[in-house]
Each structure stands twice: as C-alpha cells, then as structure tokens.
UniProtKB/Swiss-Prot annotation:
Quaternary structure and interacting proteins, as annotated: Component of the ClpX-ClpP complex. Forms a hexameric ring that, in the presence of ATP, binds to fourteen ClpP subunits assembled into a disk-like structure with a central cavity, resembling the structure of eukaryotic proteasomes.
PROSITE patterns given in the database record: CLPX_ZB
Domain of life: Bacteria
Pfam families named in the record: AAA_2, ClpB_D2-small, zf-C4_ClpX
Binding-site list for Zn(2+): 14, 17, 36, 39
CC annotations in GO: HslUV protease complex
Keyword annotations from UniProtKB, A to Z: ATP-binding, Chaperone, Metal-binding, Nucleotide-binding, Zinc
Domain ClpX-type ZB, residue spans: 2-55
Primary role: ATP-dependent specificity component of the Clp protease. It directs the protease to specific substrates. Can perform chaperone functions in the absence of ClpP.
Record's protein name: ATP-dependent Clp protease ATP-binding subunit ClpX
Binding site for ATP: 121-128
Annotated organism of origin: Aromatoleum aromaticum (strain DSM 19018 / LMG 30748 / EbN1)
Gene Ontology molecular-function annotations: ATP binding; ATP hydrolysis activity; ATP-dependent protein folding chaperone; protein dimerization activity; unfolded protein binding; zinc ion binding
Xref: SUPFAM superfamilies: Glucocorticoid receptor-like (DNA-binding domain) (SSF57716), P-loop containing nucleoside triphosphate hydrolases (SSF52540)
Length: 422
C-alpha cells in the first residue's frame, strides 16, 4: 500500500496492520505487498503457539494402553515380578479409565480410587516399576521419602510438600498435577512403634499416617505459589488430590514374622504337630499377606484401608540379577559398553563375571540396586587409566576382577609392521 507525499516521494504502509513506514522500525517489501517487523513478530508468536499445542497433543496419549500393553512395556525395563506387574497394570489401567469416565459427567455409580501398596525386599524393583508406569502414561511423577515426613508444625517435611513437588514437576499446571502419580518410598518406616494406640506423640510414625490419610483419599490441598512458605494474606494454589494415584512402597522387614505367626499355628503337648518355621522364605510369606498383618506391623487400619491394591515383589535370585545386568533396554552392561565405546574400546564382561556380580549382590542383600556399585568399583581403575592408554582395543572382565579385585585383561590393537632399511 502506497501514498504520494507532497514532494512526490511514495509513502509505504504495512499491508496487514496499515502502519506507515515511519511508525515501524522495518518494512519488508514483497510482490505488491509490504509487512512490518511488528506483524512478523506477531506471526512468529502465533506459529510458535500452534507448534507447542501440536507437540502437547501428540505427546499426550489419546488411547489408554490395555493392561497387557502396560505389562509388556514393564517387561522391557523390569525383570521378573510377573504377578506384581499384572496387579499394577490392572490397577493403573482401571484408575485412568475411571478418570476418563468421570470427565464431565455425573454417573449413578461412583468409582472410587484404588491406590497401590508395593511390598518387597530392597532392590526388587518397586521404584523402577512406578517410574516406568509414569513414563509410559506420560503423566507427572514425583517420589517422596516417608522417613523425612513429619506432622505439620514439627521440624521436617510437611505431607503437603509432596503435592508441591508434583506441581513444580509440571510447571504449575494444576490440571496436569491433578492426574499425576506420587510414589512414597519407605512407607514401612512410618509404622507406629506398637500395635496399641500410644498416649505419647509420634510425629514421624502414626502422626504422618494420620496426615497422609486425607491426602491419599482425596482432599483439596492449599499449596503456596512458586514453592514459597505459607504466610497470612497469601493466595494459595488449590490442588484436588482425588484423582492423583498414590503408590506406596516398602521393604517391611519383620512383616514375614507377623505373617508366619498368623499362618503357622504351633501346638503344645505330646500330640502337637511340629512345623518348621524356616521352610518358607520371605517372598513366600509376603504372598500370604493380609490387612491384619499390616495393622499388626504398625500401619493404622484407616491407612491400610486406603491402599486396597497390594502387590508383593519377590527376592531376586542369581539368574534374575544376571538378566537385569544384560537384558533390559537400559541394562547396566549395555551402559558401561557404551561408555567404553566412547573411548573407542570394546568391553566384554564374561559370563563367569556376571555370575560373580550377582552372587556379590545377594551376599550384600542389596538386590538389583547394588549391581551398579559392584561394577563401578570393579571398573573404576581401568576407567581412570583408559583415556591415557594408547592402542587398547578391548577390555575383558572375568570372575577374578569381581571376586578378587584383579585388573581386567587389556587387548591391544596389532601394530602395523614397518619395513626398516637393512
């Protein structure tokens, strides 16, 4: 668009907003059209917003995976624990199916939430299962340690801090946070000290259970904005926890004794049947767990009632630990091989060495969690020296490297022969 000035010079205008060339910083000419810098900036903003919306739409699952699909994906990352994975797959599927069913309608039958309790030894995969589920469903996920929680007003973390972390994880998007997953680890550590109500204050045991009750069941939590501290005359962010899935996990050391006391009746007298209490391992005992055992262990009845889905995980044997080392997508052996390949070196860990790593983890009673530290200590020296070693083509780790601390075998590239003058 153009006009003629008094001196005959043409005055140019933006074809979109109508501003003259003197009102804008830059006017760009096209075939019979002009566009100013302000309109270009506005177009960029519109396109950027549309791209972001498209990415969000593609990133969010439009179809909910079936329990079988959930279980198959869990199999790629977690070895063994078949029954626990089936329990989790069904519980998570039903939870998110319930949320889709609830959206925007009022139904005659109200579907209640089924939170989950994972019981299993250290290093059996409780945390990994919860993390993998959240990644699969593309929902916000946060972990909390129950041992750091105290009742409101005491030194320690308030239970509402868990929801604050979840809100921070999804950039203060309230709607996303209200459909997230919270994993509370070490839940067995907040059991009350005895199964009888105490007259003394137990701010990190029964007190925390009482504080968690409403949060897990569903309440509106008031969260200070941007992670600040609560103070009067402050606007709070309201988060409804009704649709947040809570998964609690713990090792529950000593629970097997409670279960055996209930299941194995020891008779007295000459005609009594004598049963050995050593026949069952911890995993077999956990499979028989009942709500009354958890109450006897130290969880209050109301808290047990809010965790209706109980999944037990088994102790990992030597073969399962070896599978964990080599099979999953993010297997430890694959990770170390990748690190060595960045130095241009192949890493071979022989089968005998894998068995030695698994046996060591079993002796330490650390389960899968201890595998990395064993491999790290065995490979530390060679990883320290490798960047300065020349000609190394392959590093071989055998049983002696794991059990006795021997140095790995180094294989060098064959040097090319240079013909010398006679």
């Amino acid at each position: 668009m153009t006009d003629k000035k008094a001196g005959g010079e043409k005055l140019l205008y933006c074809s979109f907003c109508g501003k003259s060339q003197h009102e804008v910083r830059k006017l760009i000419a096209g075939p019979s059209v002009f566009i100013c810098d302000e309109c270009i900036e506005l177009c960029n903003d519109i396109i950027r917003d549309e791209i972001a919306e498209t990415v969000d739409a593609e990133g969010t699952r439009t179809t909910l995976p079936t329990p079988q699909e959930i279980c198959e994906i869990l199999n790629q990352y977690v070895i063994g624990q078949t029954q626990a994975k089936r329990n989790l797959s069904v519980a998570v599927y039903n939870h998110y199916k319930r949320l889709r069913h609830l959206s925007g309608r009022k139904e005659e039958v109200e579907l209640s939430k089924s939170n989950i309790l994972l019981i299993g030894p250290t290093g059996s995969g409780k945390t990994l299962l919860a993390q993998t589920l959240a990644r699969l469903l593309n929902v916000p996920f946060v972990m909390a340690d129950a041992t750091t929680l105290t009742e409101a007003g005491y030194v320690g973390e308030d239970v509402e801090n868990i929801i604050q972390k979840l809100l921070q994880k999804c950039d203060y998007d309230v709607d996303k946070a209200q459909h997230g997953i919270v994993y509370i680890d070490e839940i067995d550590k907040i059991s009350r000290k005895s199964d009888n109500p105490s007259i003394t204050r137990d701010v990190s045991g029964e007190g925390v259970q009482q504080a968690l009750l409403k949060l897990i069941e569903g309440t509106v939590a008031s969260i200070p904005p941007q992670g600040g501290r609560k103070h009067p005359n402050q606007d709070f962010i309201q988060i409804d926890t009704t649709n947040i899935l809570f998964i609690c996990g713990g090792a529950f050391d000593g629970l097997e004794k409670v279960i055996r006391n209930r299941t194995e009746k020891i008779g007295i007298g000459f005609g009594a049947e004598i049963k050995s209490r050593e026949g069952k391992n911890v995993s077999e005992s956990f499979r028989q767990v009942e709500p009354e055992d958890l109450i006897k262990f130290g969880l209050i009845p109301e808290f047990v009632g809010r965790l209706p889905v109980v999944a037990t995980l088994q102790e990992l044997d030597e073969e399962a630990l070896i599978q964990i080392l080599v099979e999953p997508k993010n297997a430890l052996v694959k990770q170390y091989q990748k690190l060595f390949s960045m130095e241009g070196v192949d890493l071979e860990i022989r089968p005998a060495a894998l068995h030695a790593v698994a046996r060591k983890a079993i002796r330490r009673k650390t389960g899968a969690r201890g595998l990395r530290s064993i491999l790290e200590s065995a490979l530390l020296d060679i990883m320290y020296d490798l960047p300065t070693l020349e000609g190394v083509e392959k590093v071989v780790v055998d049983e002696g490297t794991i059990e006795e601390g021997a140095q790995p075998l180094l294989m060098y590239a064959e040097q090319p022969k240079v013909s010398g003058s006679n």
